[in-house]
Structures are given as structure tokens and as C-alpha cells.
From Swiss-Prot:
Its EC number is 3.6.5.3. Residues 174-176 are annotated as: G5. Mg(2+) binds at T26. It comes from Gloeobacter violaceus (strain ATCC 29082 / PCC 7421). This is Elongation factor Tu. GO terms for cellular component: cytoplasm. Residues 136-139 are annotated as: G4. Residues 10-214 form the tr-type G domain. GTP hydrolase that promotes the GTP-dependent binding of aminoacyl-tRNA to the A-site of ribosomes during protein biosynthesis. Keywords: Cytoplasm, Elongation factor, GTP-binding, Hydrolase, Magnesium, Metal-binding, Nucleotide-binding, Protein biosynthesis. GTP binds at residues 19-26, 81-85, 136-139.
Length: 409
């Protein structure tokens, strides 16, 4: 029993493998689990177990994702790996698997390829804060100078998309060689095989370079309003789930979105029909608001720490449009298209003003199955921030998913 408790005391970090198809993301994921399993810090997973990823739904979109977990001496990791390129795009945009950092896998034999670039761009757009690089398939290179060239290319590519290319740790090795060695000697530890040691070096780099994320509870308070009702003689109660931070009775908070920002005081907090002094991130709670009428509050507004979030009507977003097979639209759409944008707890009508491809070229139209960057104008101001996820809906069905990459107005 004591062991389970010990594991919980390690800081938890979410990471994932990204990179071009067939560069070795899944092989590396398997190699990490096999290597750390020798120390009792992971459950060894074979390539096939990870590759046959189960389907999940996130924001109405089906995504195949494999989740593995493992520990290093310092941390507990949840690691996500996707079998197909489209799954990566959907995963990163919906935030189905939020990543605090990513391991970019690049085949040293091939160098950066189109999806390498696309995944780096996506990581930048959706707010994956840190990247560590694994140059894979080193066993296929005879010339060490080639390895240096590939490393240089990768650093330039990272810098191009505003990652600190010169500082990013790059570890070279062979996931397949390490995996085969661990399969033949499951108890092999560090210092006995060069290929296996590369996996340890990679995990050292991840431990050191990817910072422990700020916990939700330490961030400024925010709760999206799901429902509102009045209690005779006591006032108005807004209910919802606290997204981050904490709130205490007697604190001043702001009501943000839809109709301008108002300040109010928390006069009471209730959970499961019991009153409490403090609500924490993750709690489903009722917040009693002083001097606020029921008609002043509606679903889609947020309660937040004063000054921590502001309402906006215009933003840029990175968006994936569902294909017909996924239950999306059957026809393309053009600039001026007006769907609903589902933000936190509510639908808001908005106009898609313009859209561009990765190169910044204006596109004529958007086809089902496309990934696109778009500028959106909402009819009502809503509390929006960078990195926030949203769904695009039409008549109640999801036709796309997106993430705010830049606030404009």
C-alpha cells in the first residue's frame, strides 16, 4: 500500500510523441516502457499494444489515441501516442490529450519531413510549451556528419516556429535497437547497452527540460456558468464546475462575458446541498452572488478572479473541420459562413471572416476534412483566452473543433 502513496507524491506531467509517419514514434513509446519496466517504473508495452489504439470521443470527434504511463526517478508521466497523422491533428486541436511537452521524433536517416513541420507548427499554435527531440534510426547512419546536418535542420525548423531551437535538447539513438535489446533482456539496466542508454538520456532530458506544469488550483479562479437560479431571501446562485483556482466566501469576483463585466461578492458557496468556505478546481459548485439579479446572469458567462480574463469578439483559431465520414458537413464552406461556436458552456453565433492555409495563403473554400487557420468574429463578447478550445456546430451537431491561437479584439 505504501508504494501507491509514494507514486502520487511525484509531480505529474503529460507528454506525447509527435513527428512524421514512420519515423518511429510508437517504437520509441514502446522502448520507453520496456526500458523503465526493468526498474519497476512502467508496465512494458509491445509495439502492437500501442499501435492498436482504442477510439475515443472528444468534442464530438472520434480519435484513436494510445495512453501509457511510466515513471522516472523524479516524475510520473502520462504519455500519449497516436497511430495516424489525422489523429494527431484532431488530438492537438481538441486538446483531448493536453500536452505539457512533446518528444519530437525525427528519423536521422530521412531528416525533417512535411509532417515534422506540421506537428511543430501545431504544437506552437495549440500551446504545447516545450519540445525535446529524439533523432531516431541512428543505427542506419554511417556518417556522423549526416547526424549533425539533421540536427542542424531540426534546430532551424524549431526556431522558425518560435521554439528555442538552439536550446532544445536533442538526443540521438535507435528506438528499435533499444526495444529489441530490452525484449531479449527484460531486466537490463542503465550502463549495459549503448542503445538502451540513449532511452535513459532522453528521459533525463525530458525530466530536466520540460517544466512541471502549474497546477490548476494555483491558477486564477475561473468557473463557467452552467445554470442560474434564485433563492428567495438569499439572492442569485450561479452553478458550474470550477475550471481552475479556488474561491472563498467574501471574495470579490467578476462576472465576464455577453454583457460587459460586473463585479460582485461571493456571499455563499454550496456543494451537494452543504455550505462550504472554499471551492477548489474540479468542484461542481453553487456560488451565491451579492446584488445580482437572476436575469443578470446567464449560461456562457464566467465567474473569475478580477482582471484575470476579458471578453472578446475577434480571434484567430487553428481548426479541424470534420469529414463527411466523421459526421461533418458534406459540402465546403466559404468566407462569411456563420455557424455556432461552442465555448465552455454555450453556443455563440460567429462569422468566419477569412481563412488561410499553413503558408498564410488565402484559401478559396474549406472542404470537410481540412485543417485551416481562421479569423472569427462573434456576435457577443465572450471570455476568451489563448489556447482555449471550442467546437464549431451547426444545428446542434459538431462540424469542427478548434483552439484559439491569437486574440484580435
Amino acid at each position: 500500500m505504501a508504494r501507491a502513496k509514494f507514486e502520487r507524491n511525484k509531480p505529474h506531467v503529460n507528454i506525447g510523441t509527435i513527428g512524421h509517419v514512420d519515423h518511429g514514434k510508437t517504437t520509441l513509446t514502446a522502448a520507453i516502457t520496456m526500458t523503465l519496466a526493468a526498474l519497476g517504473r512502467a508496465k512494458a508495452k509491445k509495439y502492437d499494444e500501442i499501435d492498436q489504439a482504442p477510439e475515443e470521443k472528444a468534442r464530438g470527434i472520434t480519435i484513436n489515441t494510445a495512453h501509457v504511463e511510466y515513471e522516472t526517478e523524479k516524475r510520473h508521466y502520462a504519455h500519449v501516442d497516436c497511430p495516424g497523422h489525422a489523429d494527431y491533428v484532431k488530438n492537438m486541436i481538441t486538446g483531448a490529450a493536453q500536452m505539457d511537452g512533446a518528444i519530437l521524433v525525427v528519423s536521422a536517416a530521412d531528416g525533417p519531413m512535411p509532417q515534422t513541420r506540421e506537428h511543430i507548427l501545431l504544437a506552437r499554435q495549440v500551446g504545447v510549451p516545450n519540445i525535446v527531440v529524439f533523432l531516431n534510426k541512428k543505427d542506419q547512419l554511417d556518417d556522423p556528419e549526416l547526424l549533425e546536418l539533421v540536427e542542424l535542420e531540426v534546430r532551424e525548423l524549431l526556431s522558425k516556429y518560435d521554439f528555442p531551437g538552439d536550446d532544445v535538447p536533442i538526443v540521438a539513438g535507435s528506438a528499435l535497437m533499444a526495444l529489441e535489446k530490452m525484449a531479449s533482456e527484460p531486466k537490463l539496466i542503465r550502463g549495459k547497452d549503448d542503445w538502451v542508454d540513449c532511452i535513459y538520456s532522453l528521459m533525463d532530458a525530458v525530466d530536466a527540460y520540460i517544466p512541471t506544469p502549474e497546477r490548476a488550483i494555483d491558477k486564477p479562479f475561473l468557473m463557467a456558468v452552467e445554470d442560474v437560479f434564485s433563492i428567495t431571501g438569499r439572492g442569485t446562485v450561479a452553478t458550474g464546475r470550477i475550471e481552475r483556482g479556488k474561491v472563498k466566501v467574501g471574495e470579490t469576483i467578476e462576472l465576464v462575458g455577453i454583457r460587459g463585466t460586473r463585479s460582485t461578492t461571493v456571499t455563499g458557496l454550496e456543494m451537494f446541498q452543504k455550505s462550504l468556505d472554499e471551492g477548489l478546481a474540479g468542484d461542481n459548485i453553487g456560488v451565491l452572488l451579492r446584488g445580482i439579479k437572476k436575469e443578470d446572469v446567464e449560461r456562457g458567462m464566467v465567474l473569475a478572479k478580477p482582471g484575470s480574463i476579458t471578453p472578446h469578439t475577434q480571434f484567430e483559431g487553428e481548426v479541424y473541420i470534420l469529414s463527411k465520414e466523421e459526421g461533418g458537413r458534406h459540402t465546403p464552406f466559404f468566407a462569411g459562413y456563420r455557424p455556432q461556436f461552442y465555448v465552455r458552456t454555450t453556443d455563440v453565433t460567429g462569422t468566419i471572416v477569412t481563412f488561410t492555409d499553413d503558408e498564410g495563403k488565402s484559401a478559396e473554400m474549406v472542404m470537410p476534412g481540412d485543417r485551416i487557420k481562421m479569423t472569427v468574429e462573434l456576435i457577443n463578447p465572450i471570455a476568451i483566452e489563448d489556447g482555449m478550445r471550442f467546437a464549431i456546430r451547426e444545428g446542434g451537431r459538431t462540424v469542427g473543433a478548434g483552439v484559439v491561437s491569437k486574440i484580435l479584439k
